[in-house]
Structure formats: C-alpha cells, structure tokens
Amino acid sequence: MASGTFTQRLLVALMIFALIADLSTLVAARPQDSDAASVAAAIRYLQELETKHAQHARPRFGKRGGYLNPAIFGQDEQEVDWQDSTFSR
C-alpha cells in the first residue's frame, strides 16, 4: 500500500504544480490597463487598418436583391435564361 499512496501523492503534487504554472501564465498574459501609450498605439493601429480596408471594400452585387439589372453587369441573355425558373432545361 505504500506504493499506492506515494503514487497518489505524486499525482496530486503534479496536478498542483500544473495548476500553479497555468495560473501564472494566465496572470502574465493579462494586458496592463495602466499603460496609456500602448492603448493609444493600439487605437492608432486599428484606425490605420480601418482606413486601409475601407479603400478595398466592394459592394456585393446580386447577392441580396433582384433590383439590379443583370444586363448592366455583363450577363448576356443566355445566362439570364438559365437563371429564369420558367426556362426549360
């Protein structure tokens, strides 16, 4: 029985060590709210990303509504016929 209790104690000690190591990394990964310079830098970075991606945004034609005329956007009559539900295939 001495071997069983030693194994149990060793297992409990390893679990406690793993818990302490996990909690220490969790605390170390927490951002510092008192550092105003890093917050300001993060806000500037996000603003730069927003302006960069706003220039590349494209409207999504034909995804949501049928109000756009397909002939305007380069679809010929055959493509329009294939989209028509009354067209016989």
Swiss-Prot record:
Keywords: Amidation, Cleavage on pair of basic residues, Digestion, Hormone, Neuropeptide, Secreted, Signal
Gene Ontology cellular component list: extracellular region
Coiled coil start-end: none
Keyword Signal: yes
Entry keyword Transit peptide: no
Signal peptide: 1-29
Source superkingdom: Eukaryota
Gene Ontology MF annotations: neuropeptide hormone activity
GO biological process terms, semicolon-separated: digestion; larval foraging behavior; neuropeptide signaling pathway; regulation of response to food; social behavior
Modified residue annotations for Phenylalanine amide: 61
Compartment(s) where it occurs, according to its Swiss-Prot or TrEMBL record: Secreted
Residues cleaved off as propeptide: 65-89
Record's function text: An integral part of the sensory system that mediates food signaling, providing the neural basis for the regulation of food response; coordinates larval foraging and social behavior changes during development. May have a hormonal role in females.
The family this protein is said to belong to: Belongs to the NPY family.
Protein name (record): Neuropeptide F
Name of the gene: npf
